[in-house]
Amino acid sequence: MLQQVNGHSLGSDAEGRASLKGDLREFLGGEIPLHQLDDLTKVNPVTLETVLRCLQARYTEDIFYTNAGCTLVALNPFKHVPQLYAPELMQEYHAAPQPQKLKPHIFTVGEQTYRNVKSLIEPVNQSIVVSGESGAGKTWTSRCLMKFYAVVAASPTSCENHKIAERIEQRILNSNPVMEAFGNACTLRNSNSSRFGKFIQLQLNRAQQMTGAAVQTYLLEKTRVACQASSERNFHIFYQICKGATKDERLQWHLPEGTAFSWLPNPESSLEEDCFEVTREAMLHLGIDTPTQNNIFKVLAGLLHLGNVHFVDSEDEALPCQVMDDTKVSVRTSALLLQLPEKMLLESMQIRTIKAGKQQQVFQKPCSRAECDTRRDCLAKLIYARLFDWLVSVINSSICADSKSWTAFIGLLDVYGFESFPNNSLEQLCINYANEKLQQHFVAHYLRAQQEEYEVEGLEWSFVNYQDNQTCLDLLEGSPISICSLINEECRLNRPSSAAQLQTRIESTLAGRPCLGHNKLSREPSFVVVHFAGPVRYHTAGLVEKNKDPVPPELTELLQQSQDPLLTMLFPANPEEKTQEELSGQSRAPALTVVSKFKASLEQLLQVLHNTTPHYIRCIKPNSQSQPQTFLQEEVLNQLEACGLVETIHISAAGFPIRVSHQNFIERYKLLRRLGPRMSSGLGGLEPAEGSSEQPLCAKEATLQPLLQDILHALPALIQTAATPSDPAKNTQIPLYCGRTKIFMTDSMLELLECGRAQMLEQCARCIQCGWRRHRLQKQEKQRRAAVLIQAAFRSWLTRKHIRRLHIAATVIKHAWHKWRIRMACLASKELDGMEEKPMPQAPGTLRSSMSPAHTRFLGAIIHLWPLGLVLANSADGVRGFQRKLVAHACLRLPSDRPSNKVQTPQQDQAGITSIRALPQGSIKFHCRKSPLQYADICPDPSASCVTGFNQILLESHRPVQV
């Protein structure tokens, strides 16, 4: 320990302890607000100890998530916290305008990736890398993120689409319990440890709705089926079928209660993962029907009985090993469940078939006891590995969407954490190698690449040292010689190789490598690799055999003869297919080893991650006993050192995680130019964020495009608008830096720009809507005016047409009236003045001869409608008294072609007056007698309303007189 404080050496250990206690009390006095620090970049000073204190203070307050710049630190609570993952909380983070301002949570990372896919300048797929030691909570974190995306990425409009989306989401969520049941197991460090790696692609369409998913798995630990370490368990599914099967199923699968199985250690322990009904229901939702499920569980029960088969050496070495008497029942039961011939099953494990020579002559050799056990284990591992791969393919076919229906994806990487056990073999070597590659991806993407980019873009940056694991990767996978290459070479040499020989070769060939060590106290052959998370000792015993992963052809041929429908599907009998050994024997091509295949799949995964925008979640395990409310500083400190969290905090506190090219920045945020005036001079008082250069915001403003300058000039107005009294920092600093080709900014600045852009888009949309409404109203007004004009013109035309018709009718009536008046006047004067003692019909006859029948009928119809006063007014002026009435009567009885309109002649009316003469001037003496005329005795009534007298005579005059 360095005994120096403020430049003064401490005189004694007592003074040092006193000073340390004083500093500790001072630190503890300020520990109260530590749990309120949501971001470790705000810790001052940023050291490993202060970060550790802050995490411990938050863990004590049941705050399990803390930001560390671009990384989220997640502490495993080792207890259920239902309110921390409630659906209401998911909706709260999804609906928040700025989720970064809420409490740190995995939902913040999930929402950030979802919004990046939704509104990213350059549409790039997103990925979330969940890393940490075994038991740190990676699987739980991935499961909660999948539930979060299932909630927020489902917003279809129609009811039918909503049902389809719900079905897809349910299938995606149901894939978790199935894969955990068949791929997870209880280990020394974790009760639900993932024994395989998986990368889940959540597929989104253009509307950011989840349309499907795809699962890719890596390196299933199939050796766990036949070999479990002390105090560990087999895969969960074996315990589920033994504990959850019904009585009928137990009889069908030959699993009586209390039966002990060699491959089922620690069956008395009860875990939450041993829920058989959840697994069966999830399989049913994924399209695996009940008969197929029963077939799967029957095969698994056959594997358990196969594990109870044990061999003993034969007395005669020329004879194969014999099965123990107490395990013969297990052979029979296993053959029955797998639907294999019992004899062939035993022979495939007891006898080895060898093909030699050019003619491929077949020889049979009895196997030793160890070889029989190895072939038995190989048969079980082969069946379980094929079954697991088939389940993954069924899950993908059930949840994967068509490639044309999705445009982007969010990847969730959940791999096994760093492992170090008392006995580490090839599985732990591959697992830790994968963690080294992921650590290098984080270092290369964030720690190294970000700082190098700052320097290239012209930012005045103080380089932060970090722990690089490239030397360890060179030891593991370097070219031309590395640990993996040496192990693969031992497999290709096809010679007996002992564990000590492999150890000697590794130590001698790779001597001098800084990350290679040796435990001199160990009696077993082994070598030590110093990983980024700590040194791990690997035993070389069985390392080469596991890397070869040989499958005897007899076992494959045996399984192809099974009558079980599932095994027939997993091992199709294809005569054209040749085994790996046959192909390698004929072509002499090197066989693919476990390390080679795993390395290839890992490179493919890293290439996918390289093409996405990564987000990191560091899961920390507070204690190795998985106890709640227990924070062991030493264990947490080792994990913080291993993952380089302090370096991450340093770079995040002073850096700009968001980088956008000038062109993309202009294309997306050119709307913000309207917020501020356009200027051609400097940017005034704008300064970069803390930790960057002291120069103005844009050091090379002359080379920038005018649009970019206008946008940068508008930023102060945008920040001033968003500033609040409680957040005065926004009034003084702009967390944005303009590099040579890119714009660098913080997450808060990006959120601010997006809010300003959304407001401008809203204003533009409002202007467009107003203009459209104005145009639509103006168009409607023009249409209304045109319609009114057309209606007025049409009504005017109709009116003129009607008036024209009335005018024509009036003209006709007027002409007819004038003709009638003239003729009546002429007729009356002739009758009165020049036609003495002439019969009255002459006038009608003359009129009839001068008028056409049509005019006569027309005038008759009109005259019959005339009132009597009009007739009398148009009669001769010299006629008075009774003669005037007779003239009127004669006028009304016009000539007509109808018989009823004929005027009686004087000969027909001899009893009345026979002529009308001009009265002589002077006194006249009338000699009266009783008149023979009809109605002569009726006196006209002067009342106009009474139809009596002469009016009655006139009305009835058209009727013929009955003689």
UniProtKB/Swiss-Prot annotation:
Positions of the Myosin motor domain: 35-758
Cellular component, GO annotation: cytosol; mitochondrial outer membrane; mitochondrion; myosin complex
GO molecular-function terms, A-Z: actin binding; ATP binding; ATP hydrolysis activity; myosin light chain binding; plus-end directed microfilament motor activity
Record-annotated IQ domain positions: 762-782, 783-812
Topology term for the membrane: Peripheral membrane protein
Residue segments, region MyMOMA region: 829-963
Region (Actin-binding): 602-624
SUPFAM superfamilies on file: P-loop containing nucleoside triphosphate hydrolases (SSF52540)
Keywords: Actin-binding, ATP-binding, Cytoplasm, Cytoskeleton, Membrane, Mitochondrion, Mitochondrion outer membrane, Motor protein, Myosin, Nucleotide-binding, Repeat
Statement: the UniProt record of this protein carries the keyword Flavoprotein: no
Protein localization: Mitochondrion outer membrane; Cytoplasm, Cytoskeleton
Comment, domains: The MyMOMA (MYO19-specific mitochondrial outer membrane-association) region mediates association with the mitochondrion outer membrane via electrostatic interaction.
Free-text function comment from the UniProt entry: Actin-based motor molecule with ATPase activity that localizes to the mitochondrion outer membrane. Motor protein that moves towards the plus-end of actin filaments. Required for mitochondrial inheritance during mitosis. May be involved in mitochondrial transport or positioning.
The protein's assembly and partners: Myosin is a hexamer of 2 heavy chains and 4 light chains: interacts with myosin light chains MYL9 and MYL12B.
Family the entry assigns: Belongs to the TRAFAC class myosin-kinesin ATPase superfamily. Myosin family.
Protein name: Unconventional myosin-XIX
Organism: Mus musculus (Mouse)
Gene name, Swiss-Prot/TrEMBL: Myo19
